[in-house]
Amino acid sequence: MARPVQLAPGSLALVLCRLEAQKAAGAAEEPGGRAVFRAFRRANARCFWNARLARAASRLAFQGWLRRGVLLVRAPPACLQVLRDAWRRRALRPPRGFRIRAVGDVFPVQMNPITQSQFVPLGEVLCCAISDMNTAQIVVTQESLLERLMKHYPGIAIPSEDILYTTLGTLIKERKIYHTGEGYFIVTPQTYFITNTTTQENKRMLPSDESRLMPASMTYLVSMESCAESAQENAAPISHCQSCQCFRDMHTQDVQEAPVAAEVTRKSHRGLGESVSWVQNGAVSVSAEHHICESTKPLPYTRDKEKGKKFGFSLLWRSLSRKEKPKTEHSSFSAQFPPEEWPVRDEDDLDNIPRDVEHEIIKRINPILTVDNLIKHTVLMQKYEEQKKYNSQGTSTDMLTIGHKYPSKEGVKKRQGLSAKPQGQGHSRRDRHKARNQGSEFQPGSIRLEKHPKLPATQPIPRIKSPNEMVGQKPLGEITTVLGSHLIYKKRISNPFQGLSHRGSTISKGHKIQKTSDLKPSQTGPKEKPFQKPRSLDSSRIFDGKAKEPYAEQPNDKMEAESIYINDPTVKPINDDFRGHLFSHPQQSMLQNDGKCCPFMESMLRYEVYGGENEVIPEVLRKSHSHFDKLGETKQTPHSLPSRGASFSDRTPSACRLVDNTIHQFQNLGLLDYPVGVNPLRQAARQDKDSEELLRKGFVQDAETTSLENEQLSNDDQALYQNEVEDDDGACSSLYLEEDDISENDDLRQMLPGHSQYSFTGGSQGNHLGKQKVIERSLTEYNSTMERVESQVLKRNECYKPTGLHATPGESQEPNLSAESCGLNSGAQFGFNYEEEPSVAKCVQASAPADERIFDYYSARKASFEAEVIQDTIGDTGKKPASWSQSPQNQEMRKHFPQKFQLFNTSHMPVLAQDVQYEHSHLEGTENHSMAGDSGIDSPRTQSLGSNNSVILDGLKRRQNFLQNVEGTKSSQPLTSNSLLPLTPVINV
């Protein structure tokens, strides 16, 4: 501890008191210490009679003057001793107007010094520096502050920028300083917190009312000292931190005299009671929602008033444009202070940054990340999720096939794109049921797919796709697009059309899709579905939907549940190629040459769909399916026939309606050769419903007979199918016939009045309407025709039983034209794939579900080539349904073979012919699928592809020959498998 320091030596103190008279006289002014000292020395210096006293008085020095009349004098010790002696003897004279009350010695004044530490707090130094700079009207920035520290505080180590930034932030939190766009300022008594709790009603309060707001909580800092804001108009804006966005246009207030500032401070603490004082003193009362700003100057009151008016209402309280607004003494300023951009900390949580400031910081860091961009991004992500969900539904088993997912307006592109996409294995019954219920109305002009609602499978309603889709796809032989994965992979070896786009004319949409499916052999399993036509396109598509599902993979229960998937568990599955092919074909695909073998299934399906009563049909379908799978086992199909016969009567009305609808659709498309009014089906239906009932009964009987005969024929049929399967390897190299050829075949079909291809939505155009009326019409319409055919059939062969069933199993083997399909077909559209085997004339009448199923003539392997050619043509035709009636070749074919068509249109086609046709259609369908690409070495695919026209012509010629042969057989010769086999080679190319 330091030694005590003597502040003053020993002295003599004189305690004086004023005289009464002097008090009265000199009350106005109080004499000072020096004046009293001079008066005291003069009075004693005149004591000439006491030379020692006079000499000592002259040597006195003024030590100090203490209030209450204490005079401290010092002099050499001898002189002080003389004064002591004079006071003892009462000889010491007082100064004028005073009297001496006491005299005494005062000890020397001593002080113990206090040592200082060497630590200098940076915060204090920064505050001092900022205060000095504010006083000097220097803009305080981090750079200028460092310079001042180096210059005026040499004893302090210069802090780094990071330390300086951190220290300043701490001072702001402690409210020792605050930051604005013009720099840092010291928080002084004139700087106060503005309340942020003013209500909406207080926004326009006058300054006199501001006192009410003061007690509220404080949030923001505002300096009322003009000196702290003066001389900064031209100063460059400076931000405290990178995240801070401050106003660049802040105007500083003029410098104020210290007394005025003090007065303002006092008044602000008193509640800001008088508006005049606010204007004069330049107090700034800024609330979060209501700010009253006046600038003060040391000018007269009027000058201050004008200055206050210049602060008009504006969004920025320091905006450059000071527009004068007529106001009274003060002008209200509605804006938040400090602005939202300022990084003001929250009162409660010092670490909390206001939301707006955070937004500004985010903008500084990542300008792209804005609210708008976030909203857009959110919308895009939502769309993406929806689309993803949409696509995921495409692969789900519960979703319908392509056609249902996409609206018709997107028809071609979406369907084609979907054909490439793998579909879910199967559509749930519910979805199929919905699809059936919601089949869109047919629009003759448009072939684009309608966005079809899912059809619940539970309803017996025929599964009919939208007429547009039906038109586009049913006739298009798109059924072939549903080829089994195995069959497709064979074609995959060399697919000349692999790279072709599927965006052809909308009319040939189904056709192109079929090609696509064929062309995309690589896709198997669920991917086969995309190739298939949307279920909305044709009811047989329901069956197709099954086929679309990887048949090997699809559970039989689904098929059975639909009664559409005709898997016979007892029958070992045929090549998946055939199976997929069969299923890929619409049930009446026989008509569409895609589902040659499916017609039987389709008929069964229709039976199930329309009758909805006969549960035996599913088994029949399964058997037929297994039969198809085996390709050689037609036995199961015949066995299943009996059940169909039983249910046929139920299905007949719906079939008739479907036929009627189909005819109407065909008329709209210009596919029918005769006007709708001329349609014998409709006339017959309208004229004679009794005959229709008779037909139904006849069909039932025929179905029964067929079932019996089919049982007999099953063995032979299986053998025949097996042979055909063996031949199928070679036959698989099916020719790819052009659409013209197919169209011709289709034309032939159309020529058949009853043959408004009833392949349910899948195979028959009548299904486009998705109504059973077509069947009814065809039934009624062809009562007479059926009768003629029946008579002819009876004449033709024993096999042709009155019921239309062929008794001999041998006959049924190859022809395998189920009487049911024939008979039903007569009532229903005569789904007569005349293209495939003119001889067989595929009397596939979609109307007769059971008969139709059988109706496809599944010719032997040899016939398969013919079938392929025909199917190719048919498939193409199906793809281009409009071309059926239009192509001259088709017309010519119609001219040449009207009788043949009628013959096959008859509902009572022999079961033998049906079986043959069924087999032929099955083989044909297989070959047709292989047309896109076939592994067979002998496949004429390349030739047929290279010269489709020549192939078509040859096919037509062969068909003509075949028809002639059929006529010959028609005389009375039974169409035995032996007789049919020789005919089939004629069609082979």
UniProtKB/Swiss-Prot annotation:
Q: Where is the composition biased (Basic residues)?
A: 427-436
Comp. bias intervals (Polar residues): 390-399, 497-508
GO terms under biological process: cell division; cellular response to nitrosative stress; inner ear development; negative regulation of gene expression; positive regulation of cyclin-dependent protein kinase activity; positive regulation of G1/S transition of mitotic cell cycle; positive regulation of G2/M transition of mitotic cell cycle; positive regulation of gene expression
**Which regions are flagged for Basic and acidic residues bias?**
526-556
Q: Name one GO cellular component term.
A: cytoplasm
The UniProt entry's coiled-coil ranges are: none
Q: Which UniProt keywords apply?
A: Activator, Cell cycle, Cell division, Cytoplasm, Cytoskeleton, Disease variant, DNA-binding, Mitosis, Nucleus, Transcription, Transcription regulation
Q: What does this protein do?
A: Involved in regulating the levels of reactive oxidative species and reactive nitrogen species and in mitochondrial homeostasis in the placenta. Required for regulation of inner ear epithelial cell proliferation via the AKT signaling pathway.
The identity of this protein, by name, is Storkhead-box protein 1
Instruction: Please tell me the species this chain comes from.
Output: Homo sapiens (Human)
Per the record, the gene is STOX1
